[in-house]
Amino acid sequence: NYQIDNSILASIDPTKVFSGNINNIDTIREYIRTLSPISSQIEREYANSLVKTDDITTMQQYFYSFWASRNALSPQIEWENYYVQVKRVNNSFTAVRMKGYETDRGRVFLKYGAPDRIVENYNEAGAYPYEIWHYYTLEKQRNKKFVFMTRDIATNDFQLIHSDAVGELSNSRWTTEIYSRTY
């Protein structure tokens, strides 16, 4: 499990790694925020406190360390590949007052990749608009689904209401929730 070691962060010279080229504090803050869907709880807590500071050097060090811990040989390429997916998610799943990576669908997409199949039901009588994402293989699990629902299709904010994947929200009454729409 990845831990934040401040002595390791301090040993990183930002001028010698790719993150040192990110000189705008708002940009590095935003890049760090995009890591949340693939971060551990410890990383998320550390990052949330870090982006509240004005310490761009530590942000650059953390950003590099985050990617080096996932791909020691090519951390920059790992980041660039991930950022392509962040832009894709932002384009597809941005909701009112939320960037795509901040939404439930964006988080699931960034964490697990594109689903193998998506069933979209936006106009079913008596049902709120919903999507069911199927993953045939999900890490070490097989045939897993994620159910997203919105009460207002105009907002594009589909919230995760059920999954049978380990570690995700499980709700045995998800069908009742979807079909509780009254006119």
Which residues fall in each region the model found?
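Beta-strand-enriched, solvent-exposed domains that form extended recognition/catalytic surfaces
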Residues: 1-2
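Residues within mature, well-folded domains
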Residues: 5-183
